[in-house]
């Protein structure tokens, strides 16, 4: 069984519990063991535009904690994965910045060495575990559910630093969904942003972005909508009703984490997957 240090980030363990619950249910069935380490802090991505050195120091500190235990890091939140990956990219190629950051880490007897890989949700499910291994665990295929996929911004952008899937035509979520019996289909707004990062300054615009995408999904007759990001999930699931008001629509789109749908196909109970915590009408697909 392969072991990874679980880097939970901030949003998943404080708000988006269903993501963590579903991860912890499906991964042991796929021979993955998550190791919980003490001392992790925020990934620092929200600070990037304010202070680069602080941003790198916080990210490097998190990586160093895992390196100390000789573990690679599994970061299921795409924003966290981007922050840690970008930090690793910079420190591995800029010796002076590496030294500067390590001077800060020395206060805690930590050192960034660059020995731990940073693994995303798509890296783990699609590339490391693989669709064949996932298929072996499927007990209740999803009966050709027509599903709209949402990648979000941080899984596929910026492409020049290397992201888990293609920035213009990502297909890894689709490949996984087909493996568990679902029927993912293309729609024009597939690559659009959820709007979540506009909440601080332009909350109405954030909800409009959310509403526009969900309205398209609903109008096109999709059975469900799937994502892998706790920030995006907050927009599409928890804020769906308010988002509908901005586009003059009553939105009733079931929104799932990819890990929840995988869990359902494995025959895991809805309670263990945290489906009772989803605020969108996920019960609508119960009879499909």
Residue spans for each PLM region:
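Iron-sulfur cluster-binding electron-transfer modules in prokaryotic oxidoreductases
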Residues: 1-288
